[in-house]
Amino acid sequence: MANLHEIIQWCDQTLKAAEFKDYAPNGLQIEGSTEVKRILCAVTASEDAIDAAIAQNADLLLVHHGYFWKGEPYPITGMRGNRIKKLIQNNISLVAYHLPLDAHPSLGNNIAIAEKLNLQNLEPLDLTEKHPIGNIGYLEQALSVDDFKAKLQNSFDFKVIHLPAEKKTIQKVGFCTGGAQDFIAKAALQNCDAYISGEVSERTFYEAKELGVHYFACGHHATERYGVQRLAQAISQQFTVESEYFELNNPI
């Protein structure tokens, strides 16, 4: 058993959450039990994840995508109201870390991608960022475009969308998990052969072709499964709590 606020303090410090300008609050979003025995982690605080937390008697739901995003309406009604009501009624805390959990050098989503693809000699995708959200890495050997796509599909268990460019082989790879397709321009500035993110926009087709960078959409959910699991495991090691991951196979 551990104290909720001690867990939050440790996470905030470990992830340097206060140093990020984000689109939603990082850390404790909804306060439930101050005593934590069990954590359920998930990519998104969906109703399915909340129901799983209730069924598993979790005291804390740890997610990458929480609530209270910039631009959302203030009233807590409808779908979001129903989710929050369930959390409060069941005394479950909601804890969310967004950009800090993308960027962390050992717990983050992006480092997990680099490790899965065995990308070496990592560099920031954007040299101006204090805590780089995206990165660049190098394959040990250049691969054909088809072989690289197959590697991605096997790694993420996802039907990868490929938007082609002219280059015949791929070795220098830019990547940023989630919905960072617009960072393809940053990858082009760094002379990447390919760029990986989660989602795709209509304009991305033209950008890949005209910028000369192969674009691969590997799934917003699929590329962001890893950070919450790593963070939950780290919490379990730091504190006397159990943790488990909830997977809902989101095709986006």
Model-derived features with residue positions:
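Active-site catalytic microenvironments in core metabolic enzymes, especially phosphate/sugar-handling
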Residues: 1-252
